[in-house]
Every structure is written in C-alpha cells, then in structure tokens.
Amino acid sequence: MAAEPNPKNFPVLSYVLARLPSFTAKSPSSSVPPFDIEQPPPSSSSSSIEIVTQMPHLTQPDVLASMTSAISDVAETRSILRTLGPRPDHESVDKARAKLSEIESFLSESFEDIALTDAAAKDEKRRQEMDQEKTWCESILKLDEVHASYEKLLKEAEERLVRIYESAEKNAAEDEENVAAVEVNEEVVGILQHASANPVDRVDLSGRKLRLLPEAFGRIQGLLVLNLSNNKLESIPDSIAGLHSLVELDVSTNSLETLPDSIGLLSKLKILNVSTNKLTSLPDSICRCGSLVILDVSFNRLTYLPTNIGPELVNLEKLLVQYNKIRSFPTSIGEMRSLKHLDAHFNELNGLPDSFVLLTNLEYLNLSSNFSDLKDLPFSFGELISLQELDLSNNQIHALPDTFGTLDSLTKLNVDQNPLVVPPEEVVKEGVEAVKTYMGQRRISMLEEEEKKKMEEEMEQANAGWLTRTTSKLKTYVADVSEYLGSNSPRDPYLERQL
C-alpha cells in the first residue's frame, strides 16, 4: 500500500491530506509519483469535486481546520513512510519470513557446534552473512507491520473525519433551524396581527418547526380550525382555552409530553388529534370535551385512559388509541353509546371490561397485536349487535365466547396468529359465516345440554320429595297404629307377675 490513501477507500481523508502544505523537499527518485497498476488512484480533481458535491460543508474553513488538526498523526506517519518506501508485496513478506526462520535455525545449530568443538572462528564469515540477511528480512517484516498499522490508522482517521463532518452538519442544520424559527416567528406575529383586526376561522402552521406557541393565540376570536401538526412543540399554553369556538385541533407529530388541563374548556371541540407525541396520560379534564366526535391519541406512551372518559364523551364516534401501552379500558367505556370505531391494536390489553358489551353501536373493532396479554373476550361479547369488522389477530385467544354466533352484522373477521381451539382451524378457514354458524350451533347444543341437566336435576328433586313425603306418611301411620294397639289390647298376666 502506498503512503497516499486511496480516495476510493478514504475519500474524506484524501481530500483533507491533499490540502495540507508540504514542507519536505522531493528527492530525484520521488519526482514521479508512485503508480499502483492494480489500483490506480483516480484523478484528484474529479474525486475532490465528487466528495464536495456529497459533503458541501468540506469547503468551510472552520470545518477543514478541525479536520486538519484531527489527522496530525496520519500526516506524521505518512511523512515517515515516504522515507521508508512502499509496502513490500505479499510474496516478499512470505519469502522474508521463511528466510528468517531458516537463518535462525542455522544460527542455532552453529552455536551448538561451537559449544561442542570449541572452534569459535570456524563459521564466523558465514554467520556474519546470515546476520546481515536476518537484518534485511526483519526490516522487510517491520516495514510491512508499519504499513499495516498505517492502514488501520487511516481507517480510524476516516471515521474521525466523518464524525467531525456530521457534527458540523448538525450544527449547520441547527443554525438553519434558528433562521427558520425567526422567519416562522415573523409569520406567527403576522397571523396574530391580522387576526386582531380581521376575523379568522382557520390557521395552518403545520410543518413550520415551531417550538413555542405564543399565549396570544388564545385570543383569536372565532377560530374554528387550528393545525399545528409536524412541529417541535413541547407544550400547549393554557390560553388555548380562550378559543371558545374551536371545532378542530390538530397537534399531531410534535414532542408533547402533556396536555393542559384547560383543554377541557373547549366545549365545542369535535375533532382532537394528538397522535405521534410523547404523552403518558391524558388530563381528566378531557372528559369535559362533551362535543368530541373523533379523538386520536395513537402513537403515544399512554398506559391508561381517564376513569370517567365514558359518561361525558357521549358523542364520541371514533376513538383511536393504537400503538400505546394501555393495559385495560376503564369500566366507563361502556357508556360511550355513540362509539362506532375503536382501534386499540398494538397495546398491552389483558382483557375487556364486562361493560364493553354495552357499546351496541360499535361497528369496527381492532384489538390485534396485544400479543401475550389478550387471552379472552367477555362472555356477552355477542351483544355487540352492530359490529361489522373485528380484528383479533396476533393475540393468545384460545376460544371465542359462546355468544359469538349472535353477531349477525359481522362480515369481516381476522383471528390469525392465535392458538384457537374453539372454533377449530378448519372452520376458521371457511370464513366468518362458518365461524358464526359453528359458534351458534355450539351455543344451542350447550343450552340444550344445560336444559337437559336442569330437567334431570328437577326430576331427581321431585322423586326425592315424593319418597320423603311417602316415608313420612308411612311413619305417621305406623305410629298411629302402634298407639291404638297399645291402648286397647289386654294386659298379659304373666307379664304382670313380680319377679
């Protein structure tokens, strides 16, 4: 390997080294640059243009200065290797290694002969020649080791330079964001100024890299729709409660960890999208948003829903809670009588409350991918009379509830990746109608069996009662007869005798 790193393997390092000043005078022998016939280096100008196109910040003086100081060890080693010469080829190294082994073996035998014959000068000349050859072989091996270490050094240096560039690129991006933030702030100020003099019903500030929402936004009268999605908001000001007319609020894809308690004062809010944030809980006050029709809290870190979410969100039709860590639904969920669409896949649900079956308007239900946590469904699951689509895939359900056959509206069913025993696999493969028929017949058979068992028990009880009554009457009759006979029969004189 030549002292100059190949631009193909070390593009950034080659670019930086090519811009280092050279203080060493070129010897006549080094007037022609080394040329590797197997791996000729590409044109320096073309490689420089290519790397600068890919990494434009390389042309910045401060970036280049940082990189130059980071590879001082490479520059020093390169200077030494220029003096030592190119790396010996593989064959030369193998020959030197074999020759060195041969020389060491010869010298060892020679020393033994000297010890035995005590003839110190016998092979002196030969040993001197061998010592010279040994030195030459060792120098070849040492040069190969230095070049190997240099190659490792080049790899480490390239990685260092890439890290420096990435850091510079990140800083540049942050600077650009700061500039953009100033521009956004000017846009926000413009919106607020316009809204103070003119009625505004819609504001769209999505994708503006906003980090902060001014308190003054809460004073925009008549605002119906506010879109703040795809920003970098970490909080929403309490002043948002001043948007009394707000119907739709979208704060999805931000960095929100909490929602303000004042959100419960948005009594006219119908659509709330807080998906793809960092929420671990919802404020209890959200239950007071009684006009909500759609609530999307998917792709967060929720572990539960507010206890009283059901009684007050009576108009909610669509609830999206997928990709959270919810372990159970509150009992009050059964009071969401308007709910039609519920998506809760990819959570940690371990079951459904018995009140869940009160959601008689529910049409779509996705409980898939709760994995090892979800093992069964409520017995009265069949009371969800409006259910049309049901996804239970990727759970641990062994048996569908016995009332499943009464889901007359069900047209789509997915129970893949469950250890189902009831219904059996062959029935599931035939489709949703086959499953409903099987479960319906199974339910009828179970009811008939229960009725038969009940009748048998009643008959046993009736028979037992008749026998008891008969025995009682017989005992009474025997007692009466005994009493009658005892009072009217003459006494036996023999029995009356004194002993």
Curated annotation (Swiss-Prot):
Tissue: Widely expressed.
Alphabetical list of Pfam families matching this protein: LRR_1, LRR_8
Keyword Plastid: no
Annotated knockout phenotype: No visible phenotype. Pirl1 and pirl9 double mutant is lethal due to a male-specific transmission failure leading to a severe pollen malformation.
Region (Disordered): 25-48
Family of the protein in this entry: Belongs to the SHOC2 family.
Function of the molecule: Leucine-rich repeat protein that likely mediates protein interactions, possibly in the context of signal transduction. PIRL9 acts redundantly with PIRL1 in the differentiation of microspores into pollen.
Protein name per its UniProtKB record: Plant intracellular Ras-group-related LRR protein 9
Annotated source species: Arabidopsis thaliana (Mouse-ear cress)
Lineage summary: Eukaryota, Viridiplantae, Streptophyta, Embryophyta, Tracheophyta
